[in-house]
Each structure stands twice: as C-alpha cells, then as structure tokens.
Amino acid sequence: MSKLEQYFDYVKINLASPQRIKKWGERRLPNGQVVGEVTKPETINYRTLKPEMDGLFCERIFGPVKDWECHCGKYKRVRYKGIVCERCGVEVAESKVRRHRMGYIELAAPVTHVWYLKSLPSYISILLDIPLKDVEQVVYFNSYVVTKPGNCTNLRYKQLLSEDEWIAIEDQLYQEDSELTGVEVGIGAEAIQKLLRDIDLEVEAESLREEILVVKGIKKDKSIKRLRVIDNFIATRSDPTWMILTVLPVIPPDLRPMVQLDGGRFATSDLNDLYRRVLNRNNRLIRLQEILAPEIIIRNEKRMLQESVDALIDNGRRGRTVMGANNRPLKSLSDIIEGKQGRFRQNLLGKRVDYSGRSVIVVGPQLELNQCGLPREMALELFQPFVIHKLIQQGLVNNIKAAKRLIQKNELIVWNVLEEVIQGHPILLNRAPTLHRLGIQAFEPILVEGRAIKLHPLVCPAFNADFDGDQMAVHIPLSLEAQAEARMLMLAPYNFLSPATGDPIIMPSQDMVLGCYYLTAENPSQQVNRSLYFSNFDDVLLAYETKLIKLHSYVWVRFNGNVDDDDEKIEEKKLDGNKKLHIYPSRIKKLDQDNNLMVQYILTTPGRILLNNVLFDSLQLQF
C-alpha cells in the first residue's frame, strides 16, 4: 500500500451522500471486476473456518485474511502482489488492508438515520416543520402523510392520515365518477425522503428571514431555530435527503473481529450480530418485493428493516433494546464511539505517548515555584536516551548496549550523569482533565527519593489539584525548539494570571492555607502560664524543638519592636525606683520614671513565631 504524506488544517465531520458511501466501499479490482456490496449475512464457514464470499468477512471485498495469500490458496507469497485469483477473485495483498477497506449494503427500502430523527433537537422534524411525534408516526408505519393534496379541499400538504382515513379517501379516488386528482400520500422513510426532496433550501431560508421580522414570541424562536438548521445545510453543501439512508456502510472486518476461543467456540463483536439482522431483513424484503407480496407484509418488513438499522447505529435510542447472549444489550456504533471508553476519548484523544510517565502527587513545600520533584527511578527511564548519549560522549561506555547494561546495574556514575542531563531540561506536568491551558505547565525537575511526584503547593489552583491521591502525567519535550517553548511560555512562574478572569491564579490553597491556620490557631485548653518567659524568638523555637513546650503553648517573649494593639490596660503596678509595670491582655510593658520603655513582653505561641519568621525571611527583613 503506497503511503501518502499530506498536511491538513482540520477534520470536518459531515453528512455523507449515498454516492460517497458507495465510493468508500466500492473497489475496482485489477481484472476490472467491481466489488464492495455485502449481500449475505454469513460470517465464516464453520467447517473450513474461512470467510464466506459476499458475506460480512468476505475476502473478495475486504482483502485476504492471511498476508499475500488468496482465499483458495492458489497464490501464496509476496511475489504475486496485486494479482487477482481467477478461481476465488481475491486480490493478493497484506492482511492489514482488512483494517481500512469498507463495504456497503444496498438497502431495499430507504430508512431514516436515527441520529437525525431522535436526537434533540430532531433535525428532520425541524427541517420539515412537523412535530417529532408525527414524524415518528410516519417513519414507523403508523400514519400516512400527504405529499401532494391535489384538488382535494379536505387535505393539506404534510397532513397526517390514519389508516381508516386514507382508505376512505382511496375509495373516493378510485370511483368511476371521482373528481379527485393528483392526491398522493406516503408512509415510512420514503415519504419523509420525498418531503425533504421538495424543500428548496435557498427559497425557504429567504422566506424565514422575512417571517422573523414580522412574527413574535414562540413562533419567532421556532423560525430562528429552523433558519439556523437550513443555513448549516447550505453552508456545508449537504442535501437534506442524505439524512435518509439508501446505502449503509459496513465497517472493516478487523474493526469488528471474530476470534476462535480454546474450546472451538467463537467470540465476535456485537456489530456482526447487528449487521446480520440488517442483512437478513433486507434480503427478506427483496424476496417479498420480487414475489409481489401483499402491501401489509412488505410494510411490516420495511418497519423491521428500519428498526434493525436504528439498532445498528444507536441501540436503545428508540424502541426495544436489542439483547445478545446473557440478556446483555448489544454494543452499537454509537456505543463504540461515545463516552469515556469510546473511540475518540479512549483511543484517539487519550493515546499513550513515548517519553511520558504517571504518578501520584505529594506536596513539596521546599521546592521553588519553577521546580517539581521527579522520582529518580522515573527520571532515569524518561531521560534514558539522553543519559546513554552522555555516557558515550564522556567515554564511559563504547556503545548503547554497554550503556544500558550500566543503567540496569544502577551504577553510581549513572546517577551523576542523570543529574547533569536534567540540568536546564524542563519537563511538562499535566493533570486531567485539562480544562484550560494552565492544566499543563513546565517545571525544572529535581530528583527525589520515592515514587511520588512532588508539586509546589502554590500551583495547585491552576491544576485544580489536591493531595488526596491525585495523579499527574509527566512529558519530556525532546527537541530544542520544544524545550525553548516550554521554558519561555509554559514555566509555572510565567503563568501567574488566569487566562479566563485575569485574576492571580498562583495563590495559597489546600495544605498551605490549612498549615497557616494551624500554626496561628489558638488552643483554648492551653492555660496562659505566667512563668514561661523567653528572652527572644530563638529561645522559644529551641524549647519547642526540644519538646519542652507545644506548638500552641502560650509563652511570653521579649520583643522591643512596635506593637499595634488597641487592648485596654487591665492593671498597673508600681515598682522600686518609680518604675511602672503596665499589664495588657497580650503584652506586658516595663517603664522607667520618665515613662520610657525599658522592656516589653508579648503573649504568643511557637506556631505564630514560626509563621512570623518565615514571612520576614521571605520579605528579607530583620528585627
């Protein structure tokens, strides 16, 4: 298969026309034969264990099961590449083509796409300007809809008729002296398709724009909603009739595999059962139409075909959910695509990438704002190519194999080289869900023991992280451009403001707030001890470290600075030599005879002194 390198700006998901669906599955073989249509519900032959021709696993349509080998075994080996076997009609190719080659089913009757019928808002209902209930009545063969009222005064365009009402009109229509002409009614997806075909989008959009200027209230809202849908159809150049399926795509067989288990039984994807139901009903409808079966039987078969296609696209969206073995609902195409475990979020957006790791985060209060603690074991694995390069560059080993052996032995020199390698090499930390750009930031790694990533507590609000078991992913920017970009744009200190509000996002939270509160909190159970006097803050901290006092013990400590205190004096004592002692609730002042301050003691706790020292050190102030 030739590889094509093509750059693109975006991926657009759009409605597919029947011709495009056919084009996906239809292929012209080198011998001129056109293949692609799946006509049989069979999967594999249970005696030969080979796929049935024209079935859901057909090798002629989807490609060979074994590399470079046709179905009958006439051609084997890569030298026959591109040859189509005359006996079985299978093209000799790689088996991996079965992962991308599609097929299609030509439906005997049109069916509505359940997403456009049953999703809210219902696009078919909005476009036709018919209530959803009424559209469903028509689609599932409960009511008729007037597609042409003709000259009948009692009928109007898009009017719903019951079975009895239509029979009464039909009787009048086929009478010899009947004056009724041009009356047409329809039922099922065919009728909806005809109504959609009758809509001229450009004309309808123009008339709605004029209507919006005149009408008010609910009618205006309804018209705006309808105009928006019509404008989208015009903008994407989509035909409304494409919401009615006449050709059904069949996804590649290797995306809905069938595997043999040890006991000889087979495990298969639910999609195969759902496709088989569609094919059985489609083939039965074709046979009934060929033998000119009564209308009521054909109509019932068309309804069953509609329900089987609904179940294939979105099982359970409408009507009874199709169950498999053990009374378990079968997984439809929608179930495979949507949700956290779906194809987009699990496999496409959530891919595992090289040079990345994941671990629990713990608080690292000793880190700088631009640093994070990276476990040594993880760092060695992530930076291994850089370490190997450095070991060879320094002449410590001769080749990659020897370097890997050295790393496996955990030699001391390896850790020294790792320290050198991570210097100035930023790493990216990401916490899911990444709801804004600050969910992924760059840090300079610091090697730490253990297996947890250490995170600076100030960056927690940006990541919306806490330390109750949260995990974060680590990514290594490899190229110099990526490293420069991470350092210049993504480093944590440069992401100070929230991009949403412009307010500071680097602020104390979680453990920091709790720690500050705990340090400064008062303990009512602790008694003010008049005998605990200290000459300075250092003595208090020494007493705390030697466990003579507790973190919340009240102490009197000498302090000669200014104290802003509005407390009233509770007692005044006269001392020898006309000296005075002024006692306040939280301080004691000793004054000389001229009222000059001699000494002052303040009431505090070791916790408050600790916080005070940290604040003053960070502000680079001294007493």
UniProtKB/Swiss-Prot annotation:
Required cofactor names: Mg(2+); Zn(2+)
MF terms (GO), sorted A to Z: DNA binding; DNA-directed RNA polymerase activity; magnesium ion binding; zinc ion binding
Keywords recorded for this protein, A-Z: Chloroplast, DNA-directed RNA polymerase, Magnesium, Metal-binding, Nucleotidyltransferase, Plastid, Transcription, Transferase, Zinc
Ligase in keyword set: no
Superkingdom field: Eukaryota
HAMAP family given in the database record: RNApol_bact_RpoC1
Family: Belongs to the RNA polymerase beta' chain family. RpoC1 subfamily.
Description of how the protein assembles with itself and partners: In plastids the minimal PEP RNA polymerase catalytic core is composed of four subunits: alpha, beta, beta', and beta''. When a (nuclear-encoded) sigma factor is associated with the core the holoenzyme is formed, which can initiate transcription.
PANTHER family, sorted: DNA-DIRECTED RNA POLYMERASE, DNA-DIRECTED RNA POLYMERASE SUBUNIT BETA
Protein name: DNA-directed RNA polymerase subunit beta'
UniProt organism field: Guillardia theta
